[in-house]
C-alpha cells in the first residue's frame, strides 16, 4: 500500500515546485526532493502519533534518521524517473490552468497539520502552515469564506 501512496506525494512535490518556476533541471530536482522531505516531515510524525507507523526510536517525533535517508534515495530516483517521463512544459501549463490540480496537497496539509497540532508536534505544524501559506499565495486554496451564507 505505501508505494501506491508514495507516487502522489512525489508528483505533488514536483508540481508544488513547479508553482515557483524553478529554473534548471538540477535545481528543480533538488527543490522537488526538498518539498518531498518536507511533506514527509509532516506525514510521519503524525502517523507515529496515531500509531500507524512504529519505529524503535527516532530523533524527530519518533521518526528515525534512516527513514529520511530512505526518502532521499527513493525520492531522488522517483523524481528523476517522473521528470524524465513527463512533458514538463505541458504539465506546467496544465498546473497553471487547473485550479484544483493540487487539491489533494491542500487536503494533506490540512489533515496532517491538524493531527500534528493535536499531538503538539510543533515543527511539523509549522511546516504544514508554510505549505498552506505557499499554496494559498499561489491560489491553490479555493476556500471562499466570504461567499458562504452564514446564518
Which sequence ranges carry the predicted segments?
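Aromatic-rich, lipid-facing transmembrane alpha helices and their immediate juxtamembrane interface loops
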Residues: 1-151
Amino acid at each position: 500500500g505505501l508505494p501506491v501512496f508514495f507516487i502522489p506525494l512525489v508528483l505533488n512535490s514536483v508540481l508544488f515546485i513547479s508553482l515557483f518556476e524553478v529554473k534548471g533541471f538540477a535545481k528543480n530536482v533538488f527543490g522537488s526532493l526538498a518539498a518531498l522531505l518536507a511533506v514527509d516531515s509532516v506525514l510521519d510524525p503524525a502517523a507515529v502519533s496515531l500509531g500507524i507507523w512504529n519505529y524503535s526510536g527516532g530523533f524527530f517525533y519518533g521518526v528515525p534518521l534512516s527513514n529520511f535517508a530512505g526518502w532521499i534515495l527513493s525520492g531522488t530516483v522517483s523524481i528523476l524517473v517522473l521528470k524524465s517521463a513527463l512533458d514538463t512544459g505541458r504539465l506546467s501549463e496544465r498546473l497553471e490552468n487547473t485550479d484544483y490540480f493540487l487539491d489533494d496537497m491542500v487536503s494533506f496539509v490540512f489533515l496532517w497539520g491538524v493531527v500534528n497540532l493535536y499531538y503538539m508536534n510543533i515543527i511539523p505544524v509549522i511546516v504544514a502552515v508554510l505549505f498552506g501559506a505557499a499554496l494559498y499565495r499561489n491560489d491553490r486554496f479555493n476556500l471562499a469564506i466570504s461567499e458562504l451564507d452564514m446564518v
